[in-house]
Amino acid sequence: MIAILLAPVYLLANYYLLRRVMGWVKAWFPFFRTARHWALPVAVQAFLACSIVIAFFLPEGRARRVMKLIGNYWLGVLLYVLLAVIAADLLRLLLGYVLPFKHIFVTTQMHRIAGCVCALVILIASIWGVVNARIIHVTPYDVTVDKTVEGMDEMKVVLVADLHLGYNIGEKQMQQMVDRINEQDADLVVIAGDIFDNEWDAVEAPETIAATLRSIRSKYGVYACYGNHDIEEPVLAGFTFRQSEKKESDPRMDEFLKDANITLLRDEGMLIDGKFYLYGRPDAHRPGRGIETRKTPDEITAGLDKDKPIIVLDHQPKELQELADAGVDIDLCGHTHDGQMFPGNLTIKLMWENACGYLQKGKMHNIVTSGVGLFGPNMRVGTKAEICPITIHFAKN
């Protein structure tokens, strides 16, 4: 429903973009002033604008994958084209009509210059966004839990999240992630949800990816919880349509994790090696198959030995105070992507108490990672893909 309501806005944005770009082209090439010369630019614009819709309705296969990738790249480019063109228009309005500089700024020559500057900014932002999205950084944290653990003064946990295996992310990105993880000599590796990108059939060569993930080295193994995208649900430009149906993961997703030697925690916890608890929560909005309502923080810790460290894995950084009050020591999350693309990296901070990074709530440490993968536009601008090795220091025995 939201996608349908926003469709006119999307169409208007593309129309506005076409008018402004063609205005700039005409400033350089006067023969584009006639309507018949608009045919090719209009056709290209229409193809790019409709690519996400075409991909949505195509059957699974190579054509759909290509159209999906084109659409995802276009969404990212469109954002920066709109930002650049709107900024140029506002500046032109200010300098040419509000301030007394019309004779300087409202000219064909200035139109050409403004267009070239916009094109350069768009090109740099888009290329950097694509390249930057493929570079996985290492963001370390150190926290202290005031509890003793027999035979252990510290432990290294590597947090990753938001793999989004599908059209954007495949084996190459996973191999880089595994290489970064294995450099850390981890005691424990955890994946805080959104392993998949809504559609199982979008995962290319799942057997190869599972084999790559099996090569993760960790003393206590690899554990995961599901996120809001770990369900089988067609998505159009980030929006879904089957609102009345219960959202569930494809059983093949579960089998994939088993094949990858990843233990899925679905509203359940484990006492690992008799030393610490690890609890994996289902997603707050889409708990998935067989779970109607996830357990509350108090229900999670009820019956646990609170003299032992309690680590919670939760896709979305929610209920932070409640988890702290319930006795949780460390809460590890993802979901936000840190906004993924400017200006989202600024606005995301208005939506979450901890949009990315570290926050302490009472005695609890909350860490939110920006994730490894991507959702929607195949770019990262102003954010980074990352893994987070967390060194947990315990009280001395």
Where are these regions (language model features)?
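Non-catalytic terminal accessory segments
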Residues: 1-134
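Residue-level detector of solvent-exposed, low-hydrophobicity positions
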Residues: 17, 22-23, 81, 87, ...
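Short, functional N-terminal and low-complexity linear motifs
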Residues: 40-42, 57-59, 108-110, 145-149, ...
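Alpha-helical transmembrane signal-anchor/signal-peptide segments
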Residues: 133-148
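Soluble catalytic domains of enzymes that build or remodel membrane lipids, polysaccharides, and related
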Residues: 147-397
